[in-house]
Swiss-Prot record:
Bias (Basic and acidic residues) ranges: 487-513
Protein name: Chaperone protein DnaK
PROSITE patterns named among the record's database cross-references: HSP70_1, HSP70_2, HSP70_3
Disordered, as annotated region: 463-532, 576-625
Family, similarity comment: Belongs to the heat shock protein 70 family.
Any GO MF annotation of the entry: ATP-dependent protein folding chaperone
Biased segments, Acidic residues type: 523-532, 606-625
InterPro entries attached to this UniProt entry: ATPase_NBD, Chaperone_DnaK, Heat_shock_70_CS, HSP70_C_sf, HSP70_peptide-bd_sf, Hsp_70_fam
Organism: Haloferax mediterranei (strain ATCC 33500 / DSM 1411 / JCM 8866 / NBRC 14739 / NCIMB 2177 / R-4)
Upper lineage: Archaea, Methanobacteriati, Methanobacteriota, Stenosarchaea group, Halobacteria
CDD domains linked to this entry: ASKHA_NBD_HSP70_DnaK-like
Encoding gene, per UniProt annotation: dnaK
Pfam assignment, any one: HSP70
HAMAP family (UniProt xref): DnaK
Biological role stated in the UniProt entry: Acts as a chaperone.
Length: 625
């Protein structure tokens, strides 16, 4: 049965989180591993198994080449794929694997199927990246009800129980992206006034700074470049992330990686002390990159720093002391610490899911488009139709004309960005309008219309007012996925889910078979008096059948289950004989006809078929283990 819950998902660069509305409040869902966040990591093992989340992260050092991290940084990149043993995966497919695990864990938590979700994206994601995220959700088998900006979602989690009018600034530094948004809150209305950011700045870059420092120091000391060793590099990455986290609460940490490499003389170890001061000097250029977007967002909103009532920090990277110091320096006030930076976005997404599902009333979300949208006109100029920070959904149109006499076609090239020359912005898509009646240049009237829906997805149309000819395009993101491609990827995702289920079944069948053999041998040894030669021979033959299938690498799971069932049936005979002998002993024991255990006692006249199946009881105990 499908749940009516709409899942709120924070699909992060480093970690993801998910939540639902429960009793009027958003609640984080604990995943299958018992954690409140799930690493956004996917791995493929040598035997073809696919791991997602913590299991994938835990084996990354042993399997660096087939472990994929931070795929979010490549969303919307048409040319990027991951090659695993000759099979190529798009960022949408890898993200869908993470979303599949989230969906499965949520279903286990709720006890029902989950079909619908609200997924968050960085506020500064362009249209391609948003569409790619939506495609990933569909590949994972989710109906994506809404794409919501992460800072907006965080503000919803912050303001759910506060009806006062206030202006907040959300400073969101995640694993791979940085966003800053200014919002006006009040009376259940969440209005984004301005947003800015950097899609290529995040906690991963702080990790990379430590990795660079470690690799340089080690090369200077030992003449070995650890970056050329994939396994050593993975160990550096894990150590860098751990050191960054430790330095948020300590002034100094020791990075100790024994046996990091080897020379002809033997193993070489890595050990360096890193102080917080040194770490902050290594990353000063990174934290400084957050200043300009923050100041620009304030300027675009028409506010000064004194107009901001509260500053909300979002993203695990905001736990770094240098972030707190920089925010106070820019805005002159201490950030709010009542919001969990790892969970706020998922909680806000769940609230938006509650709004869409009718569980939450009196909340209105007014988001904005982060970048200007327009087309290329004569001379390669970028003509804006929708300005950045326009509240969505929205639509705008403008009349254009031809540049040459007797021109019968025009090419409409759609761009997103803030540069004056079209080619310096992001090309989202293009199409051709044909069938324009020949006329002098400047005569035809061609209406170009832009429409942005509530997910920030763009539709563009062009119509020749004279002939009525029209064309339109929905800007596709990522690899430009068609419905057929999404369907194909959904089938592949479902196929992998079936493969995982079949692999689990095979392991369970093997475990059950080995357990049955062990139980059989124990029962034969402990119940010699209850087993005649014929039954012993039958059981031993059944044991041999099971062992033969266990040793046969080509045997199917069905075969293994069949021979195990045959052995279990033979073992039932031992159980029946044990109960029969026990009943007979009780019937003929001391106490006479009316005493305990006598003719009128329990079991005196019972038929063997009335006894509980002994082996079935043993099976249940084994299953519980």
């Amino acid at each position: 049965m499908a749940s009516n819950k709409i899942l709120g998902i924070d699909l992060g660069t480093t970690n993801s989180a998910f939540a639902v509305m429960e009793g009027g409040d958003p609640e984080i869902i604990v995943n299958a591993e018992g954690d409140r966040t799930t690493p956004s990591v996917v791995a493929f093992t040598d035997d073809g198994e696919r791991l997602v989340g913590k299991p994938a992260k835990n084996q990354a050092i042993q399997n660096p080449e087939h472990t994929i991290r931070s795929i979010k940084r490549h969303m919307g990149d048409d040319g990027y794929t991951v090659d695993i043993e000759g099979e190529e995966y798009t960022p949408e497919q890898i993200s869908a694997m993470i979303l599949q695990k989230i969906k499965r864990d949520a279903e286990d938590y709720l006890g029902d199927e989950v079909e619908k979700a609200v997924i968050t994206v960085p506020a500064y994601f362009n249209d391609k990246q948003r569409q790619a995220t939506k495609d990933a959700g569909e590949i994972a088998g989710l109906e994506v009800e809404r794409i919501v900006n992460e800072p907006t979602a965080a503000s919803m989690a912050y303001g759910l129980d506060d009806e006062s009018n206030q202006t907040v600034l959300v400073y969101d530094l995640g694993g791979g992206t940085f966003d800053v948004s200014v919002l006006d809150l009040g009376g259940g209305v969440y209005e984004v006034v301005a947003t800015n950011g950097d899609n290529e700045l995040g906690g991963d870059d702080w990790d990379e700074a430590i990795i660079d420092w470690l690799a340089t120091e080690f090369k200077n000391d030992h003449g070995i470049d650890l970056r050329e060793d994939r396994q050593a590099l993975q160990r550096l990455k894990d150590a860098a992330e751990e050191a960054k986290i430790e330095l948020s609460s300590r002034k100094e940490t020791t990075i100790n990686l024994p046996f990091i490499t080897a020379t002809d003389s033997g193993p070489v170890h890595l050990e360096y002390d890193l102080t917080r001061a040194k770490f902050e000097s290594l990353t000063k250029d990174l934290i400084d990159r957050t200043v300009e977007p923050t100041e620009q967002a304030l300027e675009d909103a028409g506010y000064g720093k004194d107009d901001i009532d509260d500053v909300i920090l979002v993203g695990g990277s905001t736990r770094m002391p240098q972030v707190l110091d920089k925010v106070e320096e820019i805005l002159g006030s201490e950030p709010k610490k009542s919001v969990n930076p790892d969970e706020a976005v998922a909680l806000g997404a769940a609230i938006q899911g509650g709004v869409l599902g009718g569980e939450v009333d009196d909340i209105v979300l007014l988001d904005v488009t982060p970048l200007s949208l327009g087309i290329e006109v004569k001379g390669g100029l970028f003509e804006r139709l929708i300005e950045k920070n326009t509240t969505i959904p929205t639509e705008e149109s403008k009349i254009f004309t031809t540049a040459a006499d007797n021109q019968t076609t025009v090419q409409v090239r759609v761009f997103q960005g803030e540069r004056e020359m079209a080619e310096d912005n992001e090309l989202l898509g293009e199409f051709t309008l044909s069938g324009i009646p020949p006329a002098p240049a400047g005569t035809p009237q061609i209406e170009v219309g832009f429409n942005i829906d509530e997910n920030g997805i763009v539709n563009v149309s062009a119509e020749d007012k004279g002939s009525g000819n029209a064309e339109s395009i929905t800007i596709e993101g990522g690899a430009g996925l068609s419905d057929d491609e999404i369907d194909r990827m959904q089938r592949e995702a479902e196929q992998h889910a079936e493969e995982d289920k079949e692999r689990r079944r095979a392991v369970e069948a093997r475990n059950e078979a080995e357990g049955a053999v062990q139980r059989a041998e124990t029962l034969l040894e402990e119940n010699e008096e209850n087993v005649d030669d014929e039954l012993r021979a039958d059981i031993e033959a059944a044991i041999e059948d099971v062992e033969a299938v266990l040793e046969d690498d080509d045997a199917s799971t069905d075969e293994l289950e069949d021979v195990t069932e045959d052995l279990s049936k033979e073992l039932q005979e031992i159980g029946k004989r044990m109960y029969q002998q026990q009943a007979q002993a009780q019937a003929g024991g001391p106490g006479g006809a009316g005493g305990p255990g006598g003719a009128d006692g329990p079991g005196a006249d019972a038929d063997p078929e009335d006894f509980v199946d002994a082996d079935a009881d043993f099976d249940d105990e084994d299953d519980d283990e």
